[in-house]
């Protein structure tokens, strides 16, 4: 995504999210608000939420940024909020921290048939992972019926966010844990 219009053009990392995303993540904006349900409707989502880092570096942390129109990919969008500095998603992903968030519904048809969307949700208290898996399997089945040419046999896999985030590095973490344990054992036996 390219920010133009005020100052030098900037290439930014943007993430498209559904309106309830920030509520699900349990975070409120530091300035302004998050997306409304109306803005999460195709054709009505010409709004953006900025990261704290972008707000400070490009807009000098001015509270007047809310309501301002900026240009993203040469299209006018209105800034509605700024997230707090502590908010990053995915957590611990410092190398790819988003600069801004846009409503996904504004461009939802573009994602039909693509299989790279990452869906995050919060399981209600008392609901097991198996129940959540069963519910979402029903949703996936309904989507496969609605889009028969695009389902490609893909399904839904419910996993805790933490487990998903450490999946790629888990073997290395376990090896490191074992090595530290061995060093501790050697250190204790030499006392």
Positions of PLM-derived features:
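Short, flexible hinge/linker loops that cap or flank conserved catalytic cores
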Residues: 41-42, 64, 175-176
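A short gly/proline-enriched turn/hairpin at secondary-structure junctions
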Residues: 3-7, 33-34
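Glycine-rich loop motifs involved in handling phospho/adenylate chemistry
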Residues: 37-43, 183
